[in-house]
Structures are given as C-alpha cells and as structure tokens.
C-alpha cells in the first residue's frame, strides 16, 4: 500500500521534512509529477541536502527511488542534482530509477518558457514561472509531439534517427512560434547522444516497478511536488503549474489504482506563503508579512525569490481537504508564530456583501473578496525543538485544535523548528 505526502497550500510547506521522517521506515519513494521546478531542503545532522527533481528518499540508504511517468525530466539537471548529492556522501546510483514514459525537458523548452514569460510581462499578465521549461514540456506532451525517455534510450537501430527527427520537429515549431531565438540545437543534440548510454541504467517501466512493489508488500511513499493550489485544474488558474499536483496526479503519474492508496498526508504551513504571481487573499503587505518572511526565512530553494506571506487561510485548506481527502495533517513552522501576541486565521470569504459557500474559481472574484478572520491569542514563548504535544503552550494547542475542528481532520505531526529532529508526533 502507498502513503502519500501532498502540499495543501501553494507549495513550500515543508513536505520534504515529513518525507524524510517517513523515509526511515519505507522501501520505495516515488515522485509522480512536476520536474526540477520544485525545491526543498533536508538537513541530516550538519549536512544540508537540496532537492529539486529527485525523490527525498535518497537520504535513506535502504530506500529505492523512482521518477514516475508524470514527471518531466531535464537530463542535465538530473545528473547535476545526482552529483551534488553524491558529493555530500549519498550513494544514489543503484537506488534511483526513471520511468521510460516520462517526458524530456530540453534547453529550448526552458528558453521558450522565459520568452513566454517575457511576453506576458509586457502585457502585465506574468505567471511567475520558474523558467525551468516545465510548462512548455507539458504543452508538447499534451499536443502529442513530446519526446519520452524511451525514445532516447531505445536499442532499436533506427531509434537515434527517429529521436533526431522528433527533436528537430519540436525545435522548428518553437522557431515558428518565437522567431530565431538564440539557441544551439546541434550542441544540445550532441549532449543527448552522450546521455543515451549514461541514462540507460536508470530507466525502468515505472508501472511494472510500482505494481511489483505493491505485490511484494513493500512500504511505499509517494512524494507530491508543488501543492494543490498550484494544480492545473484545481489551483488558481492560470497562476498554477502545468501538472496535476493533487491526489489525481498521484494515480495518473504513477499508474496506480485508487485502491493502492492507504493514507494521504496534507502538509500545511502554520501560516500561508506563495511564490510568484496570483491572488493571495490572506497576504499581509505590512509588518506582519515582513515578520513572517524574516523569521520563517521565506526564500525559494529553486528560485531564491522572496515568498509572499500571510495568515493561515482555512478557506483554502477546506477546499484542498475536500479534493485530496487528507487522512491526517502535518502542521509545519509553528515556531515561526512564537512572538506574535495575536494570530489571525481566515475562515470565510465575503464578496459584495455575501459570504461565499466555497472557494471561487473566478479570479476576479478571488481578488476582491474580504477575508473574515478569527483572532486567536498567541503563546509568546519559544517552542523550538519541543518533542511532546502536551509540552506545547496552551495557546499553541488551542491554535492547532481550532485547525483540526475547522477541517475535521486530525493533526498527526507538528513542526517546531528547522532541524530534522524538530518535529513532534501528536
């Protein structure tokens, strides 16, 4: 059976830390969607590991790790991240696999991603993309013109010629769309010719891999990337990523039936952050937001961009919970709220004098809602590293209880500091 870790807000909730904790007791860690546009840091002892595309399960020497067919793979970044982990002492090569059905991200995807963003910026419609080529790759995938891993590593004698044909067809289509932008197609093609043999040992049929693991009753953890509010269907479209980041993406990205899922863990920051553009109802463009940003060290691992900060939004969380069906929650970075005398929580939206019954799909509505807040007392004491739930200050426990009661989902873990060990189990 599979347990799943999913981001419940707009990403950067601290999923990697929970995955790291759970990885101590699992045998397979899988990524189902996204690419190297994700980013999180895991600290083991005094060593810090930055992950973008590769599964966090690599920190566990006994855990196998796989990128599923829903993931899009930029091969140079794949090997760069792998080498960086190996330099820090992780033995990864015999424990890391890539789906033969995963689509490839090329440099021209990244180049056109930035060109597209520049176009949108001129019209003041910027999405705030990471520029990693994720959107253009999913676009070519959806248009059935993309190139998959098996196209690159196939042993068929005509495979390389077919790969080149597919590649030039894609490049030509980008030139037609964006003009003769600066890009060396020949040089990239030569690099991929070398990658053919280097990548081959990592490539597997991911559907067969996952179903064999299930049949063998292995303990499996699926590591979600990004978060529900960035989902292509259910997020704040168009300010979203280009893949299914919710529970649906787990099934389609790994070829799993719903019956394979046992637990769905929603990871929730004790306040709310967002990177890039898009509506953010509880955002605090004031001293509160700056304080959260400063204490929480809210800077993106992948982009280095400052994260926008605001109060916890339980309207977002109610919506996220309904879609993903969390069986329990991990509240992270509770310690960031230690110095607040009062803490606000968004509990409903009002639009033109009427309370909304659900999270609105229309961004023109979302941009103009008034957030209805409940104000709770802070605890104003340092909780860093507390190991027992009962040792938390009374007001901290009340804050967590309020979240549980509102969402009707139990909290199982609470993050009380940045260290790997700073996570208590309720």
UniProtKB/Swiss-Prot annotation:
Pfam families: Adenylsucc_synt (PF00709). Mg(2+) binds at residues 12, 39. Pathway: Purine metabolism; AMP biosynthesis via de novo pathway; AMP from IMP: step 1/2. Its EC number is 6.3.4.4. The active site is at residues 12, 40. PROSITE patterns: ADENYLOSUCCIN_SYN_1, ADENYLOSUCCIN_SYN_2. It is found in: Cytoplasm. IMP binds at residues 12-15, 37-40, 130, 144, 226, 241, 305. GTP binds at residues 11-17, 39-41, 307, 333-335, 415-417. Its cofactor is Mg(2+). GO terms for cellular component: cytoplasm. Its main location: cytoplasm. One of its GO terms (biological process) is IMP metabolic process. Homodimer. Belongs to the adenylosuccinate synthetase family. Plays an important role in the de novo pathway and in the salvage pathway of purine nucleotide biosynthesis. Catalyzes the first committed step in the biosynthesis of AMP from IMP. This is Adenylosuccinate synthetase. It comes from Meyerozyma guilliermondii (strain ATCC 6260 / CBS 566 / DSM 6381 / JCM 1539 / NBRC 10279 / NRRL Y-324) (Yeast). The lineage of its organism: Eukaryota, Fungi, Dikarya, Ascomycota, Saccharomycotina.
